[in-house]
Each structure stands twice: as C-alpha cells, then as structure tokens.
Amino acid sequence: ILQCLKEKKDEKNGFVFVVNLKDIKMINDNLGDRMKTYEALTTSTMLMPRLPVYVRLDGRAFHTFCRGLDKPFDMEFVAVMREVCQDLVKQTNAKLGYVQSDEISLAWEDMSKAPFDGRLFKLTSVLASMATVSFVLNCMKYPKLKEKVENLKPNFDCRVFQLPNMIELANAFVWRENDAARNAVSMVAQANFSHKELQGKSTAEMNEMLFQEKGINFNDIKPFLKRGSYFKRVNVMKVLDEETLS
C-alpha cells in the first residue's frame, strides 16, 4: 500500500508524484479513529430541524431501459413504478409519495419525521438502494421487464432537499405534476406523429394536433397516466376477531 502511495506515474505528462511517507502515521491504536474522522467530514451532514423534507428518486438512464416498451404508456412499467412508490411510502413512513414516469417523490413534514434522523448521506444512499431493490423485484412479475432487468441492471439516483415551509413543499409536487402533464402530451404526440412533424411545437400545439388530426382528446386519458399517482399513509379502523387477538 505504501509503495503504491509513494509513486504514481502520470502517463500523459510523464512525471512522478511522490508522497512523503513520513507524513503517513501508521499508529495502530488510533487508526480507526482517524479513518472515522475522515469519513465523518463528508458523511455527517444533517438536515435542518423543523423544515419539510423532499426527496426525488430518478431511474438512471431509463431512456435505455424503456426502449422497446409500449408507447405512449407501457402499463406493466407504470404498474411497477406505482408499486415501488407504495413500497417506499410504507417503508419510510413518508407523509406523501408521488410517481410519474420513472420518477418518485417523497415528503416528510420536518426533519424529525424523516428516516435516519435526517442524516443526508444515509437518506440519499439507502433510499436509492431501496427503490432499486423494489423496482427489480416488481419487474420479475413481468417476463418482458424481467429480461430487461437481467440485461441492463437498472438503478436509481436520489436527491434530497428542504423547503422553507409546507406551502413550498406542496409546490414541489405541483412542479413535478406539471412536468408529468407536459411529458404525457409529448409522449402521446411522439406515438402519433413523426419527429419532423413535432419539431418546434409547443405542448399546446401538440395537444391541438392530437385533437384535430388524430381525434385524441387528452382529457380522455386516465388521470394517473397523464398526471401521475399519489400515495399517502392513512389510519384505518379494523375489527379483530377473538382468534386474531388470542
């Protein structure tokens, strides 16, 4: 290890970087403490207290994964993403979950309600892993998606940020829902017109083309396809029989 650290040749520039080995302290009794200190410098960031928390998870390079799926909407893929969103809401106690296309949003009222005590590094790494596992397991129900999972190894990235108040948290969801509606119009248009016909067209113009030339009324498309789906945790009253209670 020390030899590797001592010399490193730069093949492009043809010179060697030398690390002074005297600066490397190999004291066994505090090595672990030092390494943990270095780790903490980049992994100990905490969210701010008493502020809403918003998480967005995106499928990485899902344009490749979705190639060859039914257009404009593949119902198996839609079903899988809805299941992933529900799984995340259940596992993280999120106040609200929202899914559109290959994207999932989660929210908590404040940092104290978020998982992992609001540790940013944990939130981003674990939530991305949870989404990936749920997606893969749910894809296994469908042969077409199962084959894609085996070939492409899909995964998710995750970003976390906070809003100054609950109104802005709600606006974050409005932002994503508006994006979903624009994308839905575009996807339906791309399934019915050539790239040349759509070039330079606005969302409103594509919507009008669909109605006038193809007889497709965007309002007739199912809401969860054109605007996404919301999931929330609710309290329910359940009557338990004696056998269940025993």
Predicted region positions:
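Regulatory and interdomain segments flanking nucleotide-handling catalytic cores
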Residues: 4, 8, 17-246
